[in-house]
Amino acid sequence: MPTPIPGPPGVPLLGNIFDVNPAETWNSLNKLAKQYGPIFKINALGHQIVFIGNVKLLAEITDEKRFRKCVTGPVVEIRYTVNDSLFTAYDDEKSWGIAHRIMAPHATKEATEQVFNDIAEVIPDLTKKWSASPKQRIKASDDLDVILIASCMKSFFNQRVDYIANPTERKKGLECVNAFQSATMEALKRPTRPGFLNLLYKPRFSSWTSTLRNFSKEVIKSRKNTPDQSRKDMLDALLNGVDPETQQKLKESQVIDEIITIFIGAATAANLLTYAVYYLSKNPEELKKGAAEIDSVVGDGPIDLSHLNQLHYVEAILRETFRLSATAPGFNIEPIPSDSKAPVLLGGGEYEIPHNQPMIAILNAVNRDPEVFEYPEEFKPEQVLGEKWDNLPAAAKKGFGNGKRECFGKLWAWQWSFFTLASIIKETTFELENPNYELFANGAFSIKPLDMFVLFSPRK
């Protein structure tokens, strides 16, 4: 007999809507995972959702022979902004395959390495500011948000914009960041709101969507009006590429969808670096180890692509930050539809779910599985270094999602994060303005530390 899946009791008709704060959805879910364990369920206005919070069960539900990505809830809501893009397309929509085949050649390891120099050109905008003078008070997340946008603009669209030092461009960059953060947060809240409230919020949702679509239109306009920008890059593929299977091209509206999707997806990398600054500020010995490794491998010159393969400890810092932060906090899974309506068994028959049950992986809990990590709550890069990283179960490394619907740009995101972190450590020293700052993070499709100010100085 299967074990009942635990969960908070809830109230009649409304279910568990009071157990999840819509303004802090992921913080609420993380607390429930700690309280109820590796699998639990809630009822939201009559809809049951099951949550997965350990490595063993995540390994089971990421088996693509049995389960697939579930496009539901907030992911459906953000289709208002990006329609049937790579991130939001339903499993049976042909548009996903067309866009994926057109874009995929520009997301390979080789293509990612080819744009390394673009990243290396942009990141000094950030490190020059942060190392300009001692004890500069900076909200790190703002600068990382816009340097991420600048890096996307150069890597994918061959457009060089200074969002750090140019006040006019910085304002545009921050408006774009605010729009996609606000739109995704609105998408997160809409499924659990009464319909009349969603109508009241619709004008704001429309405004943020318009900001993003207009920003993306300017990217396209700039390419068309500036022949010097032309090259065989992601934007060229979006505008001119032909799907080898269907011979179809993307409409301009679809190009806009994918440009916005790139920005929304890439935001995880900027948020990861904000967390890295936090954890290294709290763990100065690990920061010293990373700096010593960079000095040994790189010396006084610039960091190049070949150096990254030798910066093992710095990469472990990044991995450990990714583990603890779970900055892409979860992903949706459901059983693959079949003619059978029989319940689906999990955990070797220990649990039973309906045949069409949506599930959400809570990576904050998965990544702290005490059965896998010796120090689940502590920042210890050594536990994800070298063979220890290699020997971890695959389900303990799902920060970018799973299978064919995992993060499309994960190679670029990791290269950007790795190089940017190494550059920050090489060029600056830093500490939290408030040594007693307590980590508070929030977000929708990606989360980051809020209200965190850092004192940056040049590294001697």
Description of each model-found segment:
Residues 284-286, 392-393, 410-449:
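Cytochrome P450 heme-binding "Cys pocket" and the immediately downstream C-terminal segment
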Residues 361-388:
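Conserved cytochrome P450 K-helix/beta-meander segment immediately N-terminal to the heme-binding cysteine loop
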